[in-house]
């Protein structure tokens, strides 16, 4: 039996920003760039998470496509570095290339996101905190039901 697909589109280039569902704590299986989009594919049985159960209880999986406003140079990725030194109070972030980032999906969790006009910040966790910033004009949530 084929799975049903329900697609929702959210525009970030409008005067009023949309309210996006946040797949908090959900595991990302893969991250790639295709057709000028950053694509996150989430694990199966995603409806077991509270953040999804209250929004789409019938969802089996989720694919999010972030359509880049210009090109893949619009994506900036930073990984938190451990603090070094005597007091270890400072934290720093190291810029990552996308190929380095795409290798971190073994235990990558989606934490939250922040929206602005044609701009998006996504906070992830893959053994360390990762901050992804991108210029995005629209986002598609493809729910696999």
Residue spans for each PLM region:
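Surface-exposed, interaction-prone regions used to assemble/regulate multi-protein complexes
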Residues: 1-145
């Amino acid at each position: 039996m084929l799975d049903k697909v329900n697609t929702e589109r959210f525009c970030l280039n409008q005067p009023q920003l949309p309210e996006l569902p946040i797949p908090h704590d959900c595991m990302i299986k893969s991250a790639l760039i295709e057709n000028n989009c950053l694509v996150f594919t989430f694990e199966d049985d995603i409806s077991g998470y509270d953040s999804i159960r209250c929004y789409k209880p019938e969802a089996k999986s989720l694919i999010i496509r972030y359509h880049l406003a210009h090109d893949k140079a619009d994506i900036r990725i930073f990984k938190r570095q451990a603090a070094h030194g005597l007091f270890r109070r400072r934290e720093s972030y190291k810029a990552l290339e996308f190929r380095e980032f795409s290798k971190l999906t073994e235990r990558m969790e989606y934490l939250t996101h922040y929206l602005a006009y044609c701009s998006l910040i996504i906070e992830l966790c893959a053994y360390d905190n990762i901050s992804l910033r991108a210029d995005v004009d629209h986002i598609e949530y493809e729910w696999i039901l």
